[in-house]
Amino acid sequence: MLYKGDTLYLDWLEDGIAELVFDAPGSVNKLDTATVASLGQALEVLEKQHDLKGLLLRSNKAAFIVGADITEFLSLFLVPEEQLSQWLHFANSVFNRLEDLPVPTLAAVNGYALGGGCECVLATDYRLATPDLRIGLPETKLGIMPGFGGSVRLPRMLGADSALEIIAAGKDVGAEHALKIGLVDGVVKQEKLIEGAIAVLRQAITGDLDWRAKRQPKLEPLKLSKIEAAMSFTIAKGMVAQTAGKHYPAPMTAVKTIEAAARFGREEALNLENKSFVPLAHTNEARALVGIFLNDQYVKGKAKKLTKDIETPKQAAVLGAGIMGGGIAYQSAWKGVPVIMKDINDKSLNLGMTEAAKLLNKQLERGKIDGLKLAGVISTIHPTLDYAGFDRVDVVVEAVVENPKVKKAVLAETEQKVRPETVLASNTSTIPIGELASALERPENFCGMHFFNPVHRMPLVEIIRGEKSSDETIAKVVAWASKMGKTPIVVNDCPGFFVNRVLFPYFAGFSQLLRDGADFRKVDKVMEKQFGWPMGPAYLLDVVGIDTAHHAQAVMAAGFPQRMQKEYRDAIDALFDASRFGQKNGLGFWRYKEDSKGKPKKEEDAAVDDLLASVSQTKRDFSDDEIIARMMIPMINEVVRCLEEGIIASPAEADMALVYGLGFPPFHGGAFRWLDTQGSAKYLDMAQQYQHLGPLYEVPEGLRNKARHNEPYYPPVEPARPVGSLKTA
């Protein structure tokens, strides 16, 4: 053994070939600060071996290196810019030493090589991969850019266009594509990986492969003519401006850095990467996006812990076909859980099966599946008008009309047709689970399971724990949701649960703005372009359905009369009374026509202004800041109340539910991350200016306490250790 660290070791393999093996404790390798330091120490040993002929890098895990240790990011990003820059210089000196070894080097890459893992293998001369490879640089999705030389080496290896596509979009690619673009040099089966790697190294050692020529382009300026450079970078900047926009600075910074570094060799180019990375790491966007990643890990870990002793349901059923039922059935079948889809008429069943078939055909068109797989999946969805097969079902989700009487009747009937241990769930969006449970003999086997539309795209499923829901019931439904590829978040019961409970105060803020003379078009524009929502409130209401929102608004008002009962006729009432139900019938706040792809495209409709005139005062202009404040304060206050009342268990779960269920702008990180970034005291000062607008604008006492004591909702993060100590393992 030449060197043994906590996460890697170095040893002789054969004939002057050494192997550096990443083998961290636990299930995966991460390129954390300790591993970078350990790699430097291993290279120091290696540099003294005069009989060294070649170096093989490999992993003892199912994945090569999954990336940097993102749990370290928030503390690293808190160190002063100069110290962070120094540490990056140190880390890059380690990878430069790997790249500068006087012998050929090869990385045998299995599974994932992402972020720092990818940057590590870019420093080797050759890369051999297994068919399950996923390799790429996802840093821009975290609000930063590659910092270990990825933005320098990748363009010089692949050419500007392919590298820009991967770096700016934060993409990873599979083995076949990586081979095509030159990111790896060969693909071999896992059992042949080491044998193949040694064979390539031997060819390089004997001179049959010119490893020096392979290495040289990574050390030089990017080989692009002025015209080629202008075309590549102009196109890339245009694409990034269109897709990322102003709220996500990292992709544009990465493109501009690669452009600026193109005319320099490795050392100068790395200095430019360093100068661009450090300011990005100190942005609110980076903290928010890293926070989302960590919250996602927390939520998934919580679900895994909850279901560790639970067997995933093997047979499911959906009550109520149609678009929603068909979407749920598709998702379950697609992920391997057969499903019975029951309805009371053939028309609805046909609609549900058509929806499932449409979604599968899209997978076929994209090349994700073949005809055989499509037929196999669709055959596991069994449409029926009766309860045949329900005695074999492990879990049933009811997705009928949003009417408590109908839902109670359907659930009570179904309870008599299933085994005593079968779990029943309701896909209600607003009706309290306790109310629906009153119709059941076994309420402990019942809970809520709120999917979001469209089911196949929306990652969140709200799991609602009723007063009598058992832990086993919750665990079974969480297990099914996880199996479906969804992110389940458990909340406690109340009208609207968590997501809709906080959404309708936001809509109420919108209605009050229109009542006071705001133009809905400007409100939409400000909330989309300035705050960053994917849709403004008017557009969102049209997509949800004005009729659906009108009904839900009444349910929420009955549940929370003190705050959500309104004493005036609002825009939603006016549109509902005029049968303008939104996208579903082509008329809402906007008029909708199908585009060439059959998707609804919104257009202005002057007729809506006459309708809204009856429920609004004389038009007046509002500043962007006032619109944002009046829209967001009711939502933020309600989110805080939900945490204080125990409806949602933690700021992390609340923020993930908002991002995954409502599209809360990820660069803000969620409501609690946004609050912490603003500071509770600053938020309180802003909110107090609008308290005269009613109870929805009254700040909860818990938040006032946070403001008084200057306390954040997330635990404070301590800066990383001094840079000098990070240079040792």
Swiss-Prot record:
GO biological process terms on file: fatty acid beta-oxidation
InterPro entries recorded: 3-OHacyl-CoA_DH_CS, 3-OHacyl-CoA_DH_NAD-bd, 3HC_DH_C, 6-PGluconate_DH-like_C_sf, ClpP/crotonase-like_dom_sf, Enoyl-CoA_hyd/isom_CS, Enoyl-CoA_hydra/iso, FA_oxidation_alpha_subunit
Catalytic activity line of the entry: a (3S)-3-hydroxyacyl-CoA + NAD(+) = a 3-oxoacyl-CoA + NADH + H(+); a (3S)-3-hydroxyacyl-CoA = a (2E)-enoyl-CoA + H2O; a 4-saturated-(3S)-3-hydroxyacyl-CoA = a (3E)-enoyl-CoA + H2O; (3S)-3-hydroxybutanoyl-CoA = (3R)-3-hydroxybutanoyl-CoA
EC number: 4.2.1.17, 5.1.2.3, 5.3.3.8, 1.1.1.35
Region named 3-hydroxyacyl-CoA dehydrogenase: 311-729
Binding site for NAD(+): M324, D343, V400, V401, E402, K407, S429, N453
Record-level GO cellular component terms: fatty acid beta-oxidation multienzyme complex
GO MF, one example: enoyl-CoA hydratase activity
Subunit structure: Heterotetramer of two alpha chains (FadB) and two beta chains (FadA).
Protein task: Involved in the aerobic and anaerobic degradation of long-chain fatty acids via beta-oxidation cycle. Catalyzes the formation of 3-oxoacyl-CoA from enoyl-CoA via L-3-hydroxyacyl-CoA. It can also use D-3-hydroxyacyl-CoA and cis-3-enoyl-CoA as substrate.
Entry's family note: In the N-terminal section; belongs to the enoyl-CoA hydratase/isomerase family.
Listed name of the protein: Fatty acid oxidation complex subunit alpha
Annotated organism of origin: Salmonella gallinarum (strain 287/91 / NCTC 13346)
Highest classification ranks of the organism: Bacteria, Pseudomonadati, Pseudomonadota, Gammaproteobacteria, Enterobacterales
Gene (UniProt): fadB
